[in-house]
Amino acid sequence: MLKSLDVGFNFAAVKPESGPRRRWCIFTSAGDQNAIHLWLQGNTQHQWDLVVAYYGDDSKEFSELAKVSSYAFRTKGGKFQILKKLVTEKPKFFDQYSHVWVCDDDIKMSAAQIDEAFAIAEFYEFWVAQPAFSPRSKISHLINEYAGSHCDYRLVNFVEENTPIFFREKLIQFLDVYDGSLTGHGNDWWYLNFFKANELGHLRNFRKTNELGRFAIIDRIQVINPHDVEKGQREIDRLQPLAERYARWVEVMIKNGLVVFPQMIFASCKISSHRIPGVPVTRFDVARRIASSPIRKLVRKYKKLSADWRKKRKATAVAGRIAQ
């Protein structure tokens, strides 16, 4: 018996519910230039379900995607817009999963890479994580580029919206406040503001080192984010032109009091052989990052000058009283 997935969009036929229950899920909104076939290559049985929202107009392409998906349906919109509608209509849809990877459909990666990225994100209990981008990739934010073999993952305050792996409970929390107004640009800043990533690394949070383990870029996994020239016209531009996406983001940012903030790396970490759970970040890591900031240096210098001035003023007052 086939289960139907009706979320208020077009009807979708999907695979039977038989088979192992998986704890991980990839969700993507796919067009006709997707790279999903790469995700499924190899003889090993992957450990995740694939949920595809197809926004193209080719019935044959949709049929092929439905064959390889756990769930597939047809609709228009961006990933997070569709997710919002899906979870609104089916609140328990993702309940069986520990992590949900909200991934662009054109990311080039293998099934083995996907399995390992999920395993690392789950093991270290990251709220949101992403794989690093190969140097061959389109790099929109320098922090996302592969850092080198000296680290397996970096603890950061920024995870881009094209490949975020969410701890499922955190994704649902964000979707509760997300109104579906953004097609693409700005979704990452929205969920990072919601999770208070913009407050990490501040001097006032010096003692809260445990909070620095919430977001990560996994350098052990390098994927390819293809350049625009490889894809031709970006399919998201057909949904909404870039200028309109940016203008809408500015409106949302003002309405919700969101901020764009400097991207920071708090620690570069290796995965130890004994694999002790938890994130090895110390206050020294925080202090080093804070001290390296030019603004922090100026503040520290100002405080030192102020303290010296107060000491001199006090000494002058004491000398005056003695002279009297």
Which residue stretches match the model-derived regions?
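Conserved catalytic core of nucleotide-sugar-dependent glycosyltransferases
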Residues: 109-197
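Intrinsically disordered, low-complexity, charge-dense segments enriched in Lys/Arg
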Residues: 32-39, 167-168, 235-237, 256
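Short beta-strand-to-loop acidic/aromatic patch adjacent to the donor-nucleotide binding site
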Residues: 95-108
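C-terminal catalytic/acceptor-binding lobe
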Residues: 1-12, 181-324
